[in-house]
Amino acid sequence: MASSMMASTAAVARAGPAQSSMVAPFNGLRSSVAFPATRKANNDLSTLPSNGGRVSCMQVWPPEGLKKFETLSYLPPLSVEDLAKEVDYLLRNDWVPCIEFSKEGFVYRENHASPGYYDGRYWTMWKLPMFGCTDASQVIAEVEEAKKAYPEYFVRIIGFDNKRQVQCISFIAYKPT
């Protein structure tokens, strides 16, 4: 028993110094020789990044009078052809088109300090979701019907993914004048 104990102690004693040499000692920061004290002045401005002079065409969104609603709200109002292209996009992705309408096109605070159910977060659904719809003209016809029934309301189109059960796209189809 004693001989086996001594053999294991000797093995541990031999392994100790070998393990400590596996980790390199910390030498501190690099020497200052690697960092030049002076830099050559570069007066050549042609090497600086540039946007190609396109700054003059950028515009600032006016803070008053123009509300941003949802996707594509920064664009001018969409024509019927543009709406049809967007609806075709959501149909190609196998999303279910839904049409909703609301008096206010944005969240507002009327009944409480934070928005609630009656403060524009939830829109009223126009009829039922259009399950099985394969043609954009069907959706456009429903939007036109909603516009006739509620001309002073906002109308939006939603693309709903029924596999993931999430809303994938939402955009304003009609803004009242």
Curated annotation (Swiss-Prot):
A Pfam family hit? RbcS
Kindly list the GO molecular function terms attached to this UniProt entry.
Answer: ribulose-bisphosphate carboxylase activity
Source organism superkingdom: Eukaryota
Record GO cellular component, one term: chloroplast
The induction comment states: Accumulates to low levels when grown under continuous white light.
Where's the transit peptide located?
Answer: 1-56
Q: What does this protein do?
A: RuBisCO catalyzes two reactions: the carboxylation of D-ribulose 1,5-bisphosphate, the primary event in carbon dioxide fixation, as well as the oxidative fragmentation of the pentose substrate. Both reactions occur simultaneously and in competition at the same active site. Although the small subunit is not catalytic it is essential for maximal activity.
Cite the record's note on assembly: Heterohexadecamer of 8 large and 8 small subunits.
Q: What is this protein called?
A: Ribulose bisphosphate carboxylase small subunit, chloroplastic 5
Q: Which organism is it from?
A: Lemna gibba
Q: What is the lineage of its organism?
A: Eukaryota, Viridiplantae, Streptophyta, Embryophyta, Tracheophyta
